[in-house]
Structure formats: structure tokens, C-alpha cells
Design a protein with these regions (language model features):
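Conserved RNase H-like, two-metal-ion catalytic cores of nucleic-acid enzymes
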Residues: 59-127
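Short, function-defining helix-loop hinge/capping sites that tune catalysis or transport
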Residues: 82-84, 143, 172, 237
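Acidic, low-complexity intrinsically disordered tails
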Residues: 254-259
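Conserved DEDDh/DEDDy metal-dependent 3′-5′ exonuclease domain
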Residues: 101-188
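Short beta-strand->loop
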Residues: 79, 132-134, 193
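Acidic, Mg2+-coordinating catalytic module of metal-dependent nucleases/exonucleases
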Residues: 182-253
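Acidic active-site catalytic centers that drive phospho-/nucleotidyl reactions
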Residues: 74-76, 140, 164, 229
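N-terminal accessory regions of nucleic-acid-interacting proteins
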Residues: 1-67
Length: 259
């Protein structure tokens, strides 16, 4: 067999088995404090328009709610299809603290740290917390419910009020926009145009590359992508609640300030 053909066949077999080797890298820096082995935590604040104490959620067919009950959340996962084999390797959450949007992120750098991440995230939810997401009812919440079940932990998301912004966005603009993805909503409503953004579809590869000894660069880009998702969730919510964020102001406030 010609050497070239042998190498091609070997490469194909590696890809099928998911054993593709990744060159080792010196760039292994994942930001944040290590809460426990393999679990990193970051906290940052973003200047943003302060919501009123009570938010009119009629646009989502929900009762008015206090802004300090809101927890915007978003996950980055090992696959986009869901299912029991898919896990979240990053959970981001944002809430209002002292007139600013606090952004917290949990990232696991080993599979063994997943249970610690799930426990930590559960501790961020109070009895009256209202969840805010974008397609979270169909994707993020069911995925996390599965992971809590497999970890034999109570599911802290079960039975909570959940404002999924995708549904009111679709009702209002599905006939006007090319699609109702969050990137489209943030551009149309907030004037946010992302630069050097890592698409969510590339997040699984970024994490797996890091696990195999590769560079952390794209994993840091995943964290930046997740943080912008959280800021946009808050901005879209305020817009739809009748507090349209001026486009120039929104663009000026896309910078996240780390504490």
C-alpha cells in the first residue's frame, strides 16, 4: 500500500474514533480563581442601563417582577444536539448588583469537576429567582436537568418561573428579520456587532482541544462569547420591557470590567 494512502487511512480512523492528537501548548491559562480542582470561577461587572425595581413582563405574558429576582443564564456545551452524552463545560449567569450587571462564569477544565460546578450554580439560585434565557426552555434547562439527574443532585431549575426571550422575540419579529437568533436580536435591538467572536458551534472543539493539552486561547474566546450573550440577554429584556437601550449607548457599554 502506498505510504500516502496508508497515512490517509490512519487519519480517517483517528477522526472516527475521536482520538485526533492535539499538539501540546504552553498557552494553558484559563482565567479565574480555582474553586476546587478543575473548576474555575470568574466574576466581572458590565456598565449597563439600570432597570426599574419592577419590570413589566407583559411582553412575555408574565406578571411584573422585581429586577433583583432575575438570573440570566447561558451554557456552553460539548455538543449542540443535546442528549445524555452532552454536558455543559461552562455556565454563565448575570444579575443586577448595585446598579451594574454582574457576570459570573463557571468553567470546568476536567470532566471530574462537573459535579462541583453543578453544586456551585445551584447555590446561586434563591427560592424566588426568575430564570432568563434565550431558547433555554428547550435547550439549556433540559440539558442541565439531565446533568443534575446523572449527578444524583436535586435540579434547582425545576418549577421556577422562566422567561425565555426567544419566544416573545419570535412573536414580534419573525416576519421582519432573517432569523431570530440572539446575534440577530442584539444587532437589531441593541446595535451590538461582535468582533472576533467565536461561534457557539466551535465551543465544543475549543474545550476538547484544551482537555487534550492544546491551547486555551479559543476557550477564553468561548468565555468572552458567553459573557456577551449574558449582556445581550439583559439588554433585550430591557428593550422588550419598554426600556429601549439607545444604540450608541449600547455600543459604548459592551466592554466588561473585571473586578
Amino acid at each position: 500500500m502506498p505510504p500516502e494512502l496508508r497515512r490517509l487511512l490512519q487519519r480517517h480512523a483517528q477522526l472516527k474514533r475521536g482520538l485526533t492528537t492535539v499538539p501540546s501548548s504552553r498557552d494553558r491559562d484559563v482565567p479565574g480563581a480555582e474553586l476546587s480542582p478543575g473548576l474555575r470561577y470568574t466574576e466581572a461587572f458590565a456598565d449597563w442601563l439600570v432597570p426599574p425595581r419592577v419590570i413589566d413582563a407583559g411582553f412575555a405574558r408574565m406578571d411584573p417582577m422585581h429586577h433583583d429576582r432575575l438570573l440570566h443564564f447561558d451554557t456552553e456545551t460539548t455538543g449542540l444536539a443535546g442528549g445524555t452524552g452532552t454536558r455543559a463545560f461552562m455556565i454563565g449567569a448575570a444579575d443586577w448588583q448595585g446598579g451594574r450587571l454582574r457576570i459570573r462564569q463557571l468553567t470546568i477544565t476536567t470532566m471530574a469537576a462537573e459535579t462541583a460546578m453543578l453544586r456551585t450554580f445551584a447555590g446561586w439560585l434563591d427560592e424566588d429567582t426568575v430564570l432568563v434565557s434565550y431558547n433555554g426552555k428547550c435547550y439549556d434547562a433540559p440539558l442541565l436537568a439531565t446533568r443534575y439527574r446523572l449527578a444524583r443532585l436535586p435540579n434547582p431549575l425545576a418549577g421556577r418561573d422562566h422567561l425565555d426571550l426567544l419566544h416573545p422575540v419570535r412573536r414580534h419579529w419573525k416576519h421582519e428579520w432573517p432569523n431570530c437568533r440572539l446575534a440577530t436580536a442584539e444587532r437589531q435591538l441593541l446595535g451590538v456587532v461582535r468582533e472576533d467572536d467565536l461561534p457557539g458551534s466551535e465551543a465544543p472543539a475549543a474545550w476538547l482541544t484544551y482537555l487534550r493539552g492544546g491551547s486555551a486561547r479559543n476557550l477564553r474566546r468561548v468565555a468572552a462569547h458567553n459573557a456577551q450573550d449574558l449582556k445581550s440577554l439583559a439588554g433585550v429584556l430591557l428593550h422588550m420591557a419598554g426600556m429601549a437601550v439607545p444604540i450608541a449607548e449600547a455600543r459604548a457599554r459592551t466592554r466588561c470590567i473585571t473586578r
